Every structure is written in structure tokens, then in C-alpha cells.
Regions:
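N-terminal leader/targeting segments and the immediate start of mature chains
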Residues: 1-19, 152-153
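Charged, gly/pro-rich active-site loop segments
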Residues: 2, 78-156
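A short, Trp-centered hydrophobic/proline-enriched beta-strand micro-motif
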Residues: 13-28, 66-70
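General beta-strand recognition
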Residues: 22, 46-47, 78, 123
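Conserved beta-strand in the GNAT
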Residues: 35-37
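A short mixed-secondary-structure module that forms the rim of ligand-binding clefts
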Residues: 39-74
Length: 156
């Protein structure tokens, strides 16, 4: 149990350190992926900013189910959940003030669109050790399971 909590914290710290991620939405019934940046993390909540004029904003309004993937040095973290648009003004202001790119692109935070992702499921995959580590965390139910990492390490 304690090992699982530690592994989950390792995965969340990985997101802090690798905040440029692949972000997947749906455009109609087709998947659409782009590079996005996690602007802030509070526990299991990830915050994002975009323009209300961008396609991603319209896609999220139509279908708030998303998945994201961070990857570096043989480690990947994949998160899944449903975004919501209830972001406090103080968080919006903090995001705008603490990201130098946003102030170059936008006059103020008030004209931007913000959303957050409460992580429902998280996969942590590390290919470095033998056998590799693959943990699946369901943060809604609290269940933790080991994922399939290859036939050589399949449970018998």
C-alpha cells in the first residue's frame, strides 16, 4: 500500500517536471492530439489554459473526455479523465502571471479559456528496470493494478 502511494507520488512529480505533454481530445468521432502544457498541478488536479477561439476549446465543450501522455527517459505517465471548466479566478490569474508565454500571446487572463482535469486514471510505465514497472491507478475507486509489460514477465 505504501509502495503504491509512493509510486503515485513519483508519477505526479514526473508530470511536474515534464509539463509539456501530448493532449488528446475528440473532434466529432475522430481522435485529435496536440502538444499542450500543464500550467499547474494541485494534488490530482491538472490545470490548463487556451484561447476560446481555438478548436481544442470547442472540442472540450462537446466532449470533455481527454487523455494525456508525458514521456521522457523510458518513463511515461498517462492520465485520463473528464475536464471541467470551473476554475477559480485566483488560479487563472496565477497561471497567467507564472507563465511567460501567456503574457506574450494574450493581453490578460480574462480573455482566455481555462479548464482543469481531475485525474481519474493514471498509468505509470518505466521501461528502465527489468522487469519494467507498469502500475495502473484508478483514483476514483482507489484500485491499483500491475499492467502487462511483456510475455517474459506475465503472471502464471
Amino acid at each position: 500500500m505504501k509502495e503504491n502511494i509512493s509510486m503515485l507520488q513519483t508519477a505526479l512529480r514526473f508530470l511536474d517536471e515534464h509539463n509539456e505533454i501530448s493532449f488528446a481530445t475528440c473532434e466529432g468521432d475522430l481522435p485529435k492530439i496536440r502538444i499542450f502544457q500543464i500550467m499547474r498541478r494541485e494534488d490530482n488536479m491538472l490545470y490548463f489554459a487556451t484561447s476560446p477561439e481555438k478548436a481544442v476549446w470547442r472540442e472540450l465543450q462537446q466532449n470533455p473526455n481527454v487523455e494525456l501522455l508525458a514521456y521522457a527517459d523510458n518513463i511515461s505517465v498517462r492520465c485520463r479523465g473528464m475536464v471541467n471548466f470551473d476554475v477559480e479566478d485566483s488560479v487563472k490569474q496565477w497561471i497567467y502571471d507564472n507563465n511567460s508565454v501567456l503574457s506574450r500571446l494574450y493581453d490578460s487572463w480574462e480573455g482566455m479559456a481555462f479548464f482543469c482535469l481531475p485525474i481519474v486514471e493514471l498509468d505509470y510505465y518505466d521501461l528502465t528496470p527489468t522487469p519494467p514497472v507498469f502500475k495502473h491507478f484508478n483514483l476514483k475507486t482507489g484500485e491499483v493494478s500491475n499492467g502487462f509489460v511483456g510475455s517474459r514477465f506475465k503472471s502464471k
